[in-house]
């Protein structure tokens, strides 16, 4: 049962719109959240995913503001995180309300090419943005917490998002280092978390108005910095999972007062059918738990009408960038290796970079950012150069195969075989049906891909009697659940 202290209840009663009931708000705070997921369209179409999972008995109810989002009903026993389909990146476990900010960012046919997600971890919104961008352009995903950067990176790789650059900074530096560099920015700000009580009953046990006021000051700094980093004409979406106006409307008002000639609020009243139920006079979405039976959330869409004066001068460019472009011979050899080994093609508009014996693939849009700030991870690691030839990296075949969908040199696994593969086991060729065994018998031995649901799981080495598992040790799972 949610523990709402008296101070919070008294505070929220004043904030609650007149047409909503405090008693209903308290009742919804005690209701468990519905499970929700988002289909990863970088790897599978929503229609195909729905067909596969409804055949397995999943009951999916669409989230109205996200074409790829669904609530799962009637399957209380589902351990979503251990499902094969989750491990292979076909879906992300994401609270329905948190799908709103990326949807707002790309509403009205926004075709932003260079995007910043200021506070990205664990990666739900960042990977949603990557899917909306269809792995094109550049997504800079930042996270202040060092431990959470690792989680963010793991989720970016699992979902096959390749046009990303990860950073580890306080979000307040972007206006200084990358002034007016982004077409669109999502600032899902750190907040008091008042909307999360349905999944954390103790979230508001020690609520205090002084804490709300204090975090509001940080939010003001963050939104100012994000606005400075936004190009004129660009879109900034400010969002939180909290309910107090001090952390929501008042932060947007602060930005408007700071840059009165450059800030324009764009209405989200028509973002989806029923959005008007949560829409404020300014056009913000203030989502109370009882409106859509979801977490509490706030979303504002802000357009930058004009350039604004930067606060600080551009810092000096950083030296000693450890990567260099591959030469034409190296690019040709690596391209041929991926095609001969896996029937995978390297994107011609991306840039192959070299660091020692490591080959990387950078988004072309990243190149102007070199030297402007330190990046934790850029693009994807393609392969290591060996004494003879190359050794492909798992993240490369996952990302590249997502673009070509089940390339020719791939062996489809059964559910049981896929389970074994993800648990680090080799696959005996005798476990395939007779036609497939005959096919394997005439195939040349060596590296090849394995897939499930026609989506690549990883690399194996065909040794004749078995397919040797090359899954990286840190990705091997102890528990993999089958639902088909």
UniProtKB/Swiss-Prot annotation:
Q: Which UniProt keywords apply?
A: Cytoplasm, Methyltransferase, RNA-binding, rRNA processing, S-adenosyl-L-methionine, Transferase
What enzyme category does the UniProt record give?
Answer: transferase
Signal sequence, start to end: none
InterPro entries named among the record's database cross-references: Methyltr_RsmF_N, MeTrfase_RsmB-F_NOP2_cat, MeTrfase_RsmB-F_NOP2_dom, Nol1_Nop2_Fmu_2, Nop2p, RCMT, rRNA_ssu_MeTfrase_F, SAM-dependent_MTases_sf
Which annotated residues bind S-adenosyl-L-methionine? Answer: 119-125, 143, 170, 188
A GO BP entry is:
rRNA base methylation
Name-wise, this protein is: Ribosomal RNA small subunit methyltransferase F
Taxonomic source organism: Shewanella frigidimarina (strain NCIMB 400)
Q: Which gene encodes it?
A: rsmF
């Amino acid at each position: 049962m949610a523990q709402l202290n008296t101070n919070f209840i008294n505070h929220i009663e004043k904030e609650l719109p007149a047409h909503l009931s405090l008693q209903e708000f308290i009742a919804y705070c005690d209701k468990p959240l519905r499970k929700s997921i988002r289909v990863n369209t970088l790897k599978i179409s929503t229609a195909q995913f729905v067909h596969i999972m409804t055949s397995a008995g999943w009951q999916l109810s669409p989230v109205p503001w996200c074409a790829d989002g669904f609530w799962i009903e009637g399957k209380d026993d589902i351990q979503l995180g251990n499902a094969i389909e989750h491990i292979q990146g076909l879906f992300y476990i994401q609270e329905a309300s948190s799908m709103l900010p990326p949807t707002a960012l790309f509403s009205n046919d926004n075709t932003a090419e260079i995007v910043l997600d200021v506070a990205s971890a664990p990666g739900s919104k960042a990977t949603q943005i990557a899917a909306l961008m269809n792995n094109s352009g550049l997504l800079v995903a930042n996270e202040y917490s060092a431990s959470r950067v690792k989680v963010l990176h793991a989720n970016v790789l699992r979902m096959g998002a390749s046009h990303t650059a990860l950073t580890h900074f306080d979000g307040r530096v972007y206006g200084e280092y990358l002034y007016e560099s982004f077409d669109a920015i999502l600032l899902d700000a750190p907040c008091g978390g008042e909307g999360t009580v349905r999944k954390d009953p103790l979230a508001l046990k020690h609520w205090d108005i002084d804490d709300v006021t204090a975090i509001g000051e940080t939010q003001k700094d963050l939104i100012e910095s994000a606005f400075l980093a936004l190009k004129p004409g660009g879109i900034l979406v400010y969002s939180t999972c909290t309910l107090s106006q001090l952390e929501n409307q008042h932060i947007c008002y602060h930005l408007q007062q700071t840059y009165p000639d450059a800030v324009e609020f764009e209405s989200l009243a028509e973002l989806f059918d029923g959005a008007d139920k949560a829409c404020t006079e300014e056009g913000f979405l203030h989502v109370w738990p009882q409106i859509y039976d979801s977490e509490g959330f706030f979303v504002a869409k802000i357009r930058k009408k004009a350039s604004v004066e930067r606060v600080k001068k551009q810092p000096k460019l950083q030296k000693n960038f450890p990567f260099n472009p591959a030469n034409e011979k190296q690019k040709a050899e690596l391209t041929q290796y991926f095609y001969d080994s896996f029937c995978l093609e390297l994107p011609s508009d991306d840039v192959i970079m070299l660091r020692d014996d490591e080959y990387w693939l950078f988004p072309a849009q990243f190149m102007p950012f070199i030297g402007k700030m330190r990046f934790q991870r850029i693009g994807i690691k393609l392969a290591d150069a060996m004494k003879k030839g190359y050794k492909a990296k798992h993240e490369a075949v996952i990302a590249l195969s997502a673009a070509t969908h089940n390339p020719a040199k791939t062996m489809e696994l059964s559910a049981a075989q896929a389970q074994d593969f993800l648990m680090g086991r080799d696959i005996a060729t005798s476990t395939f049906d007779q036609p497939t065994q005959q096919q394997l018998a005439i195939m040349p031995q060596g590296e090849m891909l394995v897939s499930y649901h026609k989506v690549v799981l990883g690399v194996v080495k065909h040794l004749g009697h078995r397919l040797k598992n090359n899954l990286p040790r840190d990705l091997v799972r102890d528990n993999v659940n089958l639902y088909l």
